Amino acid sequence: MPAKRRTKNYDNRPIGLFDSGLGGLTVVRAVREALPGEDVIYLGDTARVPYGNRSPETVELFARQDLAFLEKFGIKAAVAACNTVSALALPNILREKHSFPLGGVILAGVEAVLATGRRKVAVLGTRGTIASGAYEHALLAADPRLIVRSIACPLFVPVIEEGVTNGAIVREIFDLYLAQLLRDPPEVVLLGCTHYPLFRPALSQYLPKGTLILDSAAAAADYLSRLLKEKGLCAEPGRNGRAQYYVTDRTPGFERLARRFLDAGDGEVIDIHLADIVNS
C-alpha cells in the first residue's frame, strides 16, 4: 500500500480516519464535504464494536492496532473519529512521536465550543463518554469560566441505527434526557457522539430558539482543514478525492447503515480480517 507522492507544494497522500463502528462515517461525510480534493481511508473495526464497554487498556490497544493498519497506507494525518478512543486512548498515544499529525473528535469539539465565545455548554454523549468526563475536563481546562453540563443519552445510538431520526418516538426520547435543557437552556449544545449529527434537525426543532448546536463530525472536519493548511499538507487544487472504507466485519445491516451515515454511495468498501488489524 504505497504512499502517493508528495509534489513540491502539495501532498496527495490520504487522510486516515477510524472508529470502532459506523458512527465515524458522519466524520467522513463532513470531511468529504469540507475537503473534496482529499483522499480518505476509513477503518471501521466493526468486529469489535463497541469499544465503550472495554477497559481503557484494551481501548488503547485497539486504537494502536487501528493506527498501525492505517499507517500502511502512508497517511499524512489521522483523526480518531471515535469518542471512546479520543477519551480513553488518545491522551497516552499523543504523548509519543508520530510521523503524521494525529487528532480526535474531543479536541475538535472543544475548539469549536471555544470559537463561539459562549459560556453555557451542554454536552450530549453516550454513557461511557459522559462517565469518562473527557469533554467536561477538556472544556474546563481550556476555559475555567465555562459552565458545563454533561448528559448521557444511551438510547440515541440504537434509535438512530434503526433509522428513526424524527417523529413522536424521538420527541419522547428527547423529553427523557433533555427536558432540563428546556427549563434552563444552554447557549451551546455539543453533540459528543458521531452518531448524533443525524439527530441535528430534530434537535434544532426541540431546543429553545437561539441554541447553537455543534456536532463533533463537523468540528473534526474543520479541525482537519486547519491542520492540513498549517502543516502544508493540502492536496493539489482541482483534484477529486476518493474514499475507501475498510471494515473488519460486514454485518447484515452494514450497507443500510452506511448509506444513512454517508448520504451517498461513494467509495469502495473492502472487507478485511480482524487478523489484518491485530497483526499490524
Placement of each model-derived feature along the sequence:
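Non-catalytic structural scaffold of enzyme domains
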Residues: P2-S280
